[in-house]
């Protein structure tokens, strides 16, 4: 029995499902989850010491690769001064200045501890600012596990087959309207049904929680126009795309100006950090200068701020995003070519440092229904064949893959070669 199997058996006795986040349990692919002992660069090492080329990247934060020296040294230095103060620090001011510089739509920013906190707080702020209750989200998009957002959700909720979670009262979600991603007509219909009741739209600019589904050219600008027409706020959830798709996030890549932005993952450099921010007029409604309450004991934690600052400073260096894009394109093109050579129908989507693999006969994947029509069983087979070759992909057909600048072209070619092997086995 491997150490991962032993640890998993022990974990299931004291942790529900043996994991602290459902998608880690391998329910989406079957088998025993890997228990990771350490990581460095583009590689993770399991409890038995086996190395895997990693395309999960802790679900997105590790854009520089694992255990980056700049982040490690920043954290080590910060720890010497204390772990938490519960008071303002220079580091959080420096972080706020850097974030607002990199993301021009954010005049002001508030630090929190997770992406869920960021989206939950941004929606509360939008409701407080507009005086309206209803919100619009999209099928297959995931914005954390706040009650009002677990409606036709993606990510682990979709992997577990529970996009609508038990335990969420109907009264909590009656104000949540769900539209079809990449379908502006469905959004207009929602506004026309409730013309003066919708506080905001919240959207993943690239839907990364139903694998990787980019927006159509008119989708994000269309959402902006509809919000302006009906007096609602546009919240762009950049927890996954922020500082990854482009330095200024997907909003810079697609040239759209949101009222509020939610950040997470990369902003913490691997530490638990989230943030939300936006136009000063809206952010000024937050306590202590406004009536909308939001707080957090560990928000702006000095260790987390040190990690996040170091990460953003490195990500801001010239060439980082060009490298990410080149590596991701090389991988996507190589995987698609090998699939076609093997006669296996597949669609590969990619934007910046994100990619998604879909086993489908369709020519494109642009919405939740397209994703649900893909062959999940074939993905499971592909996942385990790649794992056999020590390539670690997300253990779910509904999660995006992530590139880092620590990946080399040799790593990419090794992955393509492994896929060729996997496709040959799948064809047989």
From Swiss-Prot:
It catalyses: (S)-4-amino-5-oxopentanoate = 5-aminolevulinate. Pfam families: Aminotran_3 (PF00202). Its main location: cytoplasm. The modification N6-(pyridoxal phosphate)lysine is found at residue 265. GO terms for cellular component: cytoplasm. It is found in: Cytoplasm. Its EC number is 5.4.3.8. SUPFAM superfamilies: PLP-dependent transferases. Pathway: Porphyrin-containing compound metabolism; protoporphyrin-IX biosynthesis; 5-aminolevulinate from L-glutamyl-tRNA(Glu): step 2/2. One of its GO terms (molecular function) is pyridoxal phosphate binding. GO terms for biological process: protoporphyrinogen IX biosynthetic process. Its cofactor is pyridoxal 5'-phosphate. Keywords: Cytoplasm, Isomerase, Porphyrin biosynthesis, Pyridoxal phosphate. It is an enzyme of class 5 (isomerase). Homodimer. Belongs to the class-III pyridoxal-phosphate-dependent aminotransferase family. HemL subfamily. This is Glutamate-1-semialdehyde 2,1-aminomutase. It comes from Proteus mirabilis (strain HI4320).
